[in-house]
Structures are given as C-alpha cells and as structure tokens.
Amino acid sequence: PNAIWTADFKGQFRTRDGEYCYPLTVVDGYSRYLLGCQGLRSTAIDLARPVFQRLFTEYGLPRIIRTDNGIPFATTALGRLSTLSVWWIRLGITPELIEPAHPEQNGRHERMHRTLKAETTRPPGGNLQAQQKRFNAFRLEYNDERPHEALNQEPPASAYEPSSRELPAKLAPIEYPGHFEMRLVSRNSGIRWKKHWVCVT
C-alpha cells in the first residue's frame, strides 16, 4: 500500500439545485482502497489542496501520485508542474502524469469511477451536501464490504494500511547556494535575464 496513489476528477455534473459538483477521488493503487471522494465546486487548487492535506494527515504520504494532465494536477508551464504538484514534490511525493488522452493508463481508477457514477449520481443529490452524503456512503461500502476480484473477493480495507511516512508539521525552507541568482519563472516558462526574455526548458 501507498506506493502509488491515483487521483482524478470524475468530470462534473449538476446537483438538483443546479450547482455543479466536481468529485475529486483518490485511490490506493495496490489495495484499491478509496481514500477520498469529495464533491467540490470546481477543480481549483485552493479547493483540492485541503482534500489532500486531510488525506495526508489521516493516511500518511504515498511515494507517487498518478494523475491525468488536467487542472490542478498539471499545467502548460515548465515541466507541466502545478502549484499542487510542486507541493507534493516538497513533501517527498513524486507526481506521475499519464500520457495525454490515455485514461486507460489509470484504468483501475476509471473503472471505479464508472461504478461511482452509476451508484451515486443517477439521479443526483438535491445539493452538494446531500451529494456528499451519497459519496460517503458509497466509500464506506466500497472499502469495507464490497468484494474485489483482484483481492480474492476481499474488500479493499482488508489490504490497506496507512503509510509510515507522516505529513510533516512544517516544510523545510528551500535553500540555494549563495552564488545562485533567483528568478521568478512566468506562466509561459520564461525569465528576464540581463534585460532579455529567456525561455527556460
């Protein structure tokens, strides 16, 4: 467990009050344990990061988090790194991006999403709070009761245990040698250097 977590948004849909819901799901790749399923108002990093903060606090840190190339996991900037994935790196987690337009590379996660959609969103909940109650009930049943063929018909909870790598209370500051010159890299992967615009690759 915790060698690889997979994370993804299950698209979006409207709850019955007309508001959009974006379910963020995180799964342990080894045990298929559904660590989190949180309905959010958007895919913005300021909504996604607290979900990961809570999961890291409760379950510890994985070695790798595998995602697609969408927001907030990746960007078009240098190395496709997002603010979220840089935070993961500082925590000692390796972000792993699947190839664009190849969701089958996260196939186990996609299969879970089909089940989640069928059992919790048809029809959708009355509002985000009601929808979250459905996600919570699904997660409990999926983890603790539902047999899984790859686990010899045992539920995911039988094969999962939290990571021994704990979330640090504080990140160590980034330190550079004294002769380094620091520059802020823009969103289009460039810096100002000696009065010129330079693309950083």
Predicted regions and their residues:
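Mobile-element integrase/transposase regions
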Residues: P1-V27, Y33, I45-P62, I89-R90, ...
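RNase H-like two-metal-ion nuclease catalytic core shared by retroviral integrases
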Residues: T67-N69, F73-I89, P95-K117, Q131, ...
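Mobile genetic element proteins and their domesticated derivatives, centered on retroelements
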Residues: D8, V26, R32, F52, ...
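C-terminal, beta-rich DNA-binding module of retroviral/retroelements integrases
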Residues: N143-T201
